[in-house]
């Protein structure tokens, strides 16, 4: 059995991939607000403590955990890491795409660090795009400086804002595509956000401020447990599930000859550029833009360069090239 921690766009993708198996699985979220269509999954709602998660995994005979939760769900990630390490359960992290850190925004390691940098600017009118859960930790700043927080138009978000004592006159609600209009209304002298990635509309959030020359401060995403294995799209997810839970999908998938040849070429090129360093797997980009890793069985020096071999795996599809050695030499 597989347990997904979702509540995100990535969680929806993971559930849709697992539904292709026709097998049951569990989909866990902290709240019941996300609308997600589960064909074969069973919804589980409510925060899990260490003990609750450990008992659930044991009781439901979970053999694989997929962490597709929000990157800033730090407590959940920590709990998943501790419980799975204790029980010896593998974890796949379905990771979202993040913008390259280019220095165009001011990075902050914590909310305390962010407050210090805002005070040093100094900032007198703040637009916070960090969400309702950041109102409380940023209270030392907004108690002294005019600040506007954008939150989701939901009762639970309003309850959290009220509990923190934040004035509702300075609350704005999220509406997709209205980043520029909100910036024009508030006219802030600083904007703060989180490193939320493409599915968190990171670039759209910061574009108005950057265009106006207004400083943008970003909370960097917290580190994840070291034993996590990362996948970056539906193909990589399915291949990893096939490897870790061999009986979950009735049919195994494979890669094309072209993808296999690309992996061999990447390994040969790497050896040529890095003094013969041998890769046992090579990362390639599929036409969809997803990064996947394919195994490389052999890398050897030739008279003019390096040659690598990757073996073609076609899965359960009938293919005469299945298990064929695909070689590529780079000179």
Question: Which residues does each PLM region occupy?
Answer:
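A short, flexible N-terminal coil/short beta segment enriched in small residues
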Residues: 1-24, 69-77, 112-148
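N-terminal beta-loop-helix "entrance" segment that forms/cooperates
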Residues: 26-48, 103-106, 158-164, 290-295
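Short, polar loop motifs at secondary-structure junctions
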Residues: 27-35, 94-99, 132-134, 152-157, ...
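Glycine-rich, highly charged phosphate/nucleotide-binding loops
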Residues: 41-57, 171-181
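Glycine/small-residue-rich loop that forms an oxyanion/phosphate-binding "nest" at active or ligand-binding sites
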Residues: 54, 60-114
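Anionic-ligand binding region
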Residues: 129-172, 176-177
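A C-terminal functional module that forms or caps the active site or interfaces directly
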Residues: 160-212, 217-221
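Generic N-terminal targeting/processing segments that precede catalytic cores or assembly contacts
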Residues: 249-331
